[in-house]
């Protein structure tokens, strides 16, 4: 089934620093909020991608937050990139702001792109991770495993432990 894209789309980039266990619940909260909002207003989450710090490092991610200077590597622990789309521009703007607010409650910072060019820049890092994944086994587990969203923090911490143990 092919669906027509709604008339108005905004892209959010949400950066989270610190512990994954503190940040990951925002994925579930945003998903739940957006599914309810789609039923209420027709505004939908047209895509949501999670990038962890390994991917961010691999693609040379340019952190948008000013907080990066005090975070050791300068990279967020996790980034979410998502498209929020609908037929009513005001509804899309309001709901996008609410998604940023939800991220703020979990220590995240949100950045919003409105123009097609700015939106494309937000998605460019995700596109680069896909290219890297095609040419290396470094991220193979992400392609082969479906992780229940509420357990994403456990997965992230577990992979980090394995990376440290196996890097000896």
Regions found by a protein language model. Give the residues of each.
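Noncatalytic alpha-helical scaffold of FAD-dependent oxidoreductases
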Residues: 1-168
